[in-house]
């Protein structure tokens, strides 16, 4: 092979001033291609025939072959190499090949560029690869094996500990006695407890205990053996090997046994540690329950029949995937909540985190840090993680009492090692081997195997409120004396490096004096007496003798000893970046889209903190969505109050301790629904707090609380009366609404559909496809509301709007969801925050629009002025609304309605007229701002999403086998332009919505009540989807008296009420003789939808257009349906059902397009049609 050095008689030195040569030299220097020039070699005429020696040419010949375009290519190559990113649209590789092909085969520089190209191509891939296909690499093994696919036993449970630092300093053969060291340097004086300087709570140290025992469990038989894996795989919960793992699994549906954890050792720690593990157990069970419901890509298809192998695979796939997700949340808590608190980042408004999983790009100037290489923990870090000085006073007492009882009444501070460990052995063996039979802190298991929430929450609340101890000398509780003595003996038996050797190993400066270790003269003098030289101080207990770090904001929050502070960060990076399941295999495909999202951090919430998800999934019925206890449990609440006040965020959180939310009772019969929803005195609406949150002014005033749906007081009724006066519908206006919506629907079909296929003779039949929910139904509703309220919507005509179609719908949907669909406590904090921002932004634009019109129509005053001068200026002319639709169109040859001009004049000006009427109706002496947030914005929020849901469910019914028989007749009616045909279509719409719609409305019970209820319908045993009930032939016999206590909640299931044969005869059939005002999906009673007379026209108009499409059908496969699941409430543990035995409710949950989250409404469904 040719040498890479320059040689031969043709070689000459290039002058530094020679620009082309200088360029190649610089390029070579960057690319690492050039070596030192070699002297010319002699010409030997008798060289072997295959000698690698051949003549090479220099830059002179290269320049003769290249042009300016080639120089540009080299510059581009250099830039790409430095950045590590190649924009292939610039065809760099192809241009480089063109350049190289021009150079002579003997070109020295050409060879070097070629070598650089080969190096770059080689480094594009991992060598060797770190991830692999195959079932054995798909999930975490119970014992941690196969994490490194090339060294499968690296870090496996039962391995020997590794050694980090080389011990070279001569060890004193007669070191000080561990008992003396503990009594003088480590023991805590009970009267001199030092609270943690940063007011860190005990919960952080409980979490640290889980981490420590996740990766360190020393064998009592052979202290060089680690009984657990070297990975953060939650082995205290899941077990250290397959046998232990099986003991905690339910072996059904991927579940863990309720409220269990595998490790017996955990029962020897304060009960808060066990509660945290139970919370992870509950999170796991929530996740696997959700995975089974969603069944992403049919990967968790439930077997049918008695195929044992299939059922075992189903259970295992769910369990293992759930474990990956739960460990994903665990590691995110470690990296964000835990490490941010350690670094005091929780005290500043910054979302920066130390995340070892960062995706490093490959470039000329740097190479990515290796990842997924595995890990094996070392003895040094086993000693680093002994943080007994952080034990709180309460936990000191608990541990002392527990050990005293285990020792038969003897003080643990005076117990000998044999006595101590004999007692611990007896204590551990006193717990049953079956995790489900164990108790915790005196709590007893319920019938379903779980613990009562209140007992667990009490332990956790007290732990959050209990400040931990400070690091530093003389602060380890006396009850830990035997444990610490054992630790020192183990460190000596392991022959670990000294404190200075370890510090040097991790890159820290060696201590030169004892005062460098700790400036406290007492501590320094004791160290000098024990060791004689700083270089001789043992790692353990040396790290306990170090002075703790000061509080630095941000930078130092845990305030550990200096060596510990640096070491734990290195270890965190190593544990995470070396773990295949946290790096190269931590993907949505492996965790599912839902699982990946469920474990993910969101920097817009708590600057990335994620532990609130654990709290809300474990205890969904106790913590408020903004509870400081759930969002920041690693610092005591009183200190969190100071932190949040300094950041201006104190009002964002609730400072109340957790308490159980009111119990909810389901009401099903139509008669009971009518009774409750018409009784405003004893049953109150519950949306006032949410509406008020969205509309509250910074100054404290809150006009939204007076809105119609915010309460049942006279002021709320007055708001409804005002709103009803503003929503007028003369016959001519109804026609214009219909025309507007039909034209808008045709325009949306034209704008957002795609031609996907040509077929038939001469390919003249064209097939079109569109997402009918996302791009038609949702946007038609958004455009209508934008027109009615003069909202600033952009159009294709270039109108000066603010929101696109989809942006407007998302904003309206967000606001609606925060008021009416806020039932997932783990998502509520972000939902409410985003909805308030959307409300304030849109409200400010509406207010600005009204103020601008005030300069034209003097009936409008400045936003802070009273509205008192009532004129008809706007009604007599009106400015153009922000959102104008298109109507008067015609159908072109492609079956899509074309633009035909402006919207009908009356609807076009109706938006401004509506605003004027609402402001005037709001009352004398009120400002425009009050009217906007007290009446206009809440009324805007109350509509769009509900109509989208109703229409989507109706269309789905008629496109299913259940309702398809009606399509031909509906299509015929849709082709007719008569009022009768339109009204008949409306009846079809209402019937389809009644059969498929899912609506339930809550009420707060204001006084003790009794209600007669019954069960109108039952699940069809032949229907696995639970979509189709059957009428209950013994409905009357199921009548029962429901006792409702003051302060409890009722959920009136209007879905079941819509299938009640006493109100809707033949409830499962489409009948066109029902009264349109009898339907329940707009609500019942005084809070029934105020605008139902209007929206029934808008919905029918959209429905009519869709029915006119030729060959209307679903798109192929799953794209043509929306995934619908029976709705169920998560109550903290699998199988736990609150209240009565569940019946058919008809309520459904949906999933979004990528199946990463649940939704209250269908979001996507693609349809096709031909022309």
Swiss-Prot record:
Q: Which GO terms describe its biological process?
A: fatty acid metabolic process; response to oxidative stress
Cite the record's Low complexity compositional bias ranges: 1-22, 881-895
**Residues reported to bind heme b:** 213, 388
Q: What is the effect of changing residue 1098 to D?
A: Does not affect the enzymatic oxidation of linoleic acid (18:2n-6)
Residues the record lists as binding Ca(2+): 214, 229, 231, 233, 235
Give the region (Epoxy alcohol synthase) as residue ranges.
675-1171
Q: Extract the Gene3D superfamilies matched here.
A: Cytochrome P450, Haem peroxidase domain superfamily, animal type
Q: Which cysteines are joined by disulfide bonds?
A: none
Task: Output the InterPro entries linked to this UniProt entry.
Answer: Cyt_P450_CS (IPR017972), Cyt_P450_sf (IPR036396), Haem_peroxidase_animal (IPR019791), Haem_peroxidase_sf (IPR010255), Haem_peroxidase_sf_animal (IPR037120), Oxylipin_biosynth_metab (IPR050783), Ppo-like_N (IPR034812)
Entry EC number(s)? 1.13.11.60, 5.4.4.6
Which UniProt keyword terms apply here? Calcium, Dioxygenase, Heme, Iron, Isomerase, Metal-binding, Oxidoreductase
The annotated consequence of gene deletion is: Impairs the production of 8-hydroperoxy-8(E),12(Z)-octadecadienoic acid (8-HPODE) and 7,8-dihydroxy-9(Z),12(Z)-octadecadienoic acid (7,8-DiHODE). Does not affect appressoria and conidia formation, nor the infection of rice leaves and roots.
Which residues carry out catalysis? 385
Taxonomic superkingdom: Eukaryota
Quaternary structure (record): Homotetramer.
Q: What is this protein called?
A: 7,8-linoleate diol synthase
Species for this entry? Pyricularia oryzae (strain 70-15 / ATCC MYA-4617 / FGSC 8958)
């Amino acid at each position: 092979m040719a040498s890479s050095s320059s040689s031969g008689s043709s070689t000459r030195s290039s002058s530094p001033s020679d620009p082309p040569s200088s360029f190649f030299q610089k390029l070579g220097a960057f690319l690492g291609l050039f070596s030192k020039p070699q002297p010319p070699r002699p010409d030997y005429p008798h060289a072997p025939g295959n000698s690698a020696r051949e003549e090479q040419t220099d830059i002179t010949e290269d320049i003769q072959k290249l042009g300016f375009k080639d120089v540009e290519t080299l510059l581009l190559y250099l830039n790409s190499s430095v950045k590590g990113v190649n924009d292939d649209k610039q065809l760099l590789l192809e241009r480089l090949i063109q350049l190289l092909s021009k150079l002579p085969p003997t070109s020295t520089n050409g060879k070097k560029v070629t070598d650089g190209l080969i190096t770059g191509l080689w480094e594009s891939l991992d060598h060797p690869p770190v991830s692999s296909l195959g079932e054995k690499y798909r999930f975490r093994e119970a014992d941690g094996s196969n994490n490194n696919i090339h060294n499968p036993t690296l870090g496996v449970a039962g391995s020997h500990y590794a050694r980090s630092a080389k011990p070279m300093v001569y060890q004193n053969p007669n070191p000080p006695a561990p008992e003396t060291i503990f009594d003088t340097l480590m023991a805590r004086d009970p009267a001199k407890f030092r609270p943690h300087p940063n007011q860190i709570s005990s919960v952080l140290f409980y979490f640290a205990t889980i981490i420590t025992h996740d990766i360190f469990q020393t064998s009592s038989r052979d202290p060089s053996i680690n009984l657990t894996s070297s990975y953060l795989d939650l082995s205290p919960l899941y077990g250290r090997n397959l046998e232990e793992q099986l003991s905690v699994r339910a072996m059904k549906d991927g579940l863990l046994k309720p409220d269990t954890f595998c490790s017996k050792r955990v029962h020897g720690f304060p009960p808060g540690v066990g509660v945290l593990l139970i919370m992870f157990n509950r999170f796991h069970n929530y996740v696997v329950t959700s995975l089974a419901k969603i069944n992403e890509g049919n990967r968790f298809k439930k077997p049918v029949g008695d195929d044992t192998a299939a059922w075992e695979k189903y259970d295992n796939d769910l369990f293992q995937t759930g474990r990956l997700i739960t460990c994903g949340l665990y590691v995110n808590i470690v990296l964000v909540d835990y490490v941010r608190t350690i670094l005091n980042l929780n005290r500043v408004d910054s979302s920066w985190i130390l995340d070892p999983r960062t995706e490093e790009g490959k470039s000329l100037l740097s190479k990515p840090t290796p990842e997924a290489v595995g890990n094996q923990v070392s003895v040094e870090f086993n000693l680093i993680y002994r943080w007994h000085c952080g034990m709180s006073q309460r936990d000191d007492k608990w541990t002392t009492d527990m050990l005293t009882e285990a020792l038969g009444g003897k003080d643990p501070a005076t117990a000998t090692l044999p006595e101590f460990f004999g007692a611990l052995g007896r204590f551990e063996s006193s717990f049953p081997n079956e995790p489900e039979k164990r108790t915790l802190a005196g709590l007893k298991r319920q019938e379903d195997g779980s613990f009562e929430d209140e007992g667990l929450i009490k332990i956790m609340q007290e732990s959050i409120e209990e400040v931990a101890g400070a690091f530093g000398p003389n602060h380890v509780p006396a009850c830990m004396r035997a444990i610490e003595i054992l630790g020192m003996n183990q460190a000596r038996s392991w022959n670990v490096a000294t404190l200075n050797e370890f510090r040097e190993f991790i890159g820290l400066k060696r201590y030169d004096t004892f005062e460098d270790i700790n400036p406290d003269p007492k501590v320094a003098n004791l160290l000098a007496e024990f060791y004689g030289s700083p270089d001789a101080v043992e790692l353990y207990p040396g790290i306990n003798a170090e002075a703790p770090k000061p509080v630095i904001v941000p930078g130092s929050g845990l305030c550990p000893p200096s060596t510990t502070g640096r070491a734990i960060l290195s270890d965190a990076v190593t544990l995470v970046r070396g773990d295949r399941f946290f790096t190269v295999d931590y993907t949505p495909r492996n965790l599912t889209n839902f699982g990946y999202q469920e474990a993910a951090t969101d920097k817009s919430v708590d600057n990335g903190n994620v532990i609130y998800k654990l709290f809300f999934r474990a205890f969904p019925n106790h913590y408020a969505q903004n509870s400081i206890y759930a969002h920041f449990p690693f610092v005591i609440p009183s200190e969190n109050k100071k932190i949040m006040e300094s950041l201006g965020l104190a009002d964002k959180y609730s400072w109340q301790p957790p308490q159980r939310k009111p119990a909810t009772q389901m009401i099903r019969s139509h008669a009971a629904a009518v009774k409750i929803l018409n009784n405003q005195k004893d049953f109150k609406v519950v949306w006032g707090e949410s509406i008020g949150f969205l509309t509250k002014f910074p100054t404290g005033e809150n006009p939204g609380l007076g809105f119609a749906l915010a309460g049942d007081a006279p002021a709320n009724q007055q708001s409804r009366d005002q709103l009803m006066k503003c929503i007028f519908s003369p016959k001519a206006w109804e026609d214009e609404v219909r025309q507007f919506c039909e034209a808008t629907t045709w325009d949306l079909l034209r704008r957002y559909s795609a031609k996907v296929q040509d077929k038939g003779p001469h390919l003249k039949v064209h097939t079109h496809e569109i997402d009918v929910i996302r791009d038609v139904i949702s946007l038609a509703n958004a455009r209508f509301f934008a027109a009615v309220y003069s909202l600033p919507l952009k159009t294709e005509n270039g109108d000066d709007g603010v929101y696109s179609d989809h942006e407007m719908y998302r904003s309206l949907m967000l606001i609606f969801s925060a008021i009416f669909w806020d039932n997932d406590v783990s998502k509520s904090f972000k939902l409410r925050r985003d909805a308030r921002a959307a409300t304030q932004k849109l409200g400010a634009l509406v207010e600005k629009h009204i103020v601008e019109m005030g300069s034209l129509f003097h009936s409008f005053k400045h936003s802070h002025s009273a509205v008192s001068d009532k004129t008809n200026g706007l009604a007599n002319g009106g400015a153009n609304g922000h959102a104008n639709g298109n109507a008067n169109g015609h159908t072109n040859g492609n079956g899509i309605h074309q633009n035909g001009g402006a919207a009908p004049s009356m609807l076009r000006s109706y938006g401004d007229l509506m605003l004027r009427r609402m402001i005037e109706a709001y009352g004398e002496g009120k400002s425009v701002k009050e009217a906007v947030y007290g009446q206009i914005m809440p009324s805007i929020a109350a509509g769009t999403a509900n109509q989208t849901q109703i229409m989507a469910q109706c269309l789905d019914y008629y496109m299913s086998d259940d309702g398809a028989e009606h399509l031909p007749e509906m299509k015929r009616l849709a082709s007719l332009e008569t009022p009768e045909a339109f009204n008949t279509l409306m009846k079809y719409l209402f019937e389809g919505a009644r059969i498929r719609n899912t609506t339930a409305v809550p009420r707060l019970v204001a006084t003790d009540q009794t209600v007669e209820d019954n069960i109108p319908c039952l699940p069809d045993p032949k229907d696995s989807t639970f979509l189709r009930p059957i009428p209950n032939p013994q409905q009357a016999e199921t009548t029962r008296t429901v006792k409702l206590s003051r302060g409890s909640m009722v959920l009136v299931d209007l879905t079941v009420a819509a299938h009640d044969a006493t109100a809707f005869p033949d409830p499962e059939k489409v009948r066109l003789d029902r009264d349109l005002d009898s339907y329940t999906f707009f609500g019942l009673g005084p809070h029934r939808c105020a605008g139902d007379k209007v929206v029934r026209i808008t919905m029918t108009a959209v429905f009519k257009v869709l029915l006119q499409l030729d060959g209307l059908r679903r798109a192929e496969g799953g794209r043509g349906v929306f995934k619908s699941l029976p709705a169920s409430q998560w109550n903290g543990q699998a199988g736990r059902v609150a209240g009565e035995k569940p019946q058919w409710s008809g309520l459904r949950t949906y999933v979004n397009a990528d199946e990463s989250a649940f939704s209250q409404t269908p979001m996507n469904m693609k349809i096709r049609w031909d022309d």
